[in-house]
């Protein structure tokens, strides 16, 4: 379970991801949203869920960027409508529409670049990132 953000830009992050991870992001965003609607079980206490808690609208924006890039690469997407509906619901609920405070934190994004390099070194080497491939994830949770 992970939402990869090698960049503070959702669209740029989507463009950077390999197909395997890009496709999974859409599904994992849905799983995180569903987990946030529960009080126990599943992924409720996973750090990826906790870091987006209170920022559901931004998670949907991130997911939309993943869906757009997925379609741009020629794949079919069946999740964009789910995220659009969720945004409407969250706006109606008065949820926080602002980006999370960790977006733009260089140590956070560097940890994601590092882990992407570890997972698929041949693919991610093209970006010339300076991070070593062994940094731990930075989980911005309390």
Residue ranges of model-derived segments:
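Expand to "…catalyze enediolate/carbanion chemistry for C-C bond making/breaking, isomerization
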Residues: 1-142
């Amino acid at each position: 379970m992970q939402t990869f953000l090698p960049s503070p830009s959702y669209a740029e992050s989507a463009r950077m991801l390999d197909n395997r991870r890009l496709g999974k992001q859409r599904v994992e965003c849905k799983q995180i949203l569903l987990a946030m609607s529960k009080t126990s079980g599943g992924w409720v206490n996973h750090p990826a869920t906790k870091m987006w808690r209170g920022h559901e609208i931004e998670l949907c924006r991130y997911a939309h960027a993943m869906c757009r890039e997925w379609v741009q690469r020629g794949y079919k997407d069946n999740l964009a409508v789910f995220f659009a509906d969720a945004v409407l619901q969250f706006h109606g609920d008065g949820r926080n529409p602002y980006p999370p405070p960790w977006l733009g934190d260089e140590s956070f994004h560097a940890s994601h670049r590092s882990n992407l390099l570890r997972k698929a070194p041949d693919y991610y080497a093209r970006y010339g990132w300076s991070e070593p491939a062994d940094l731990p994830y930075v989980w911005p949770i309390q």
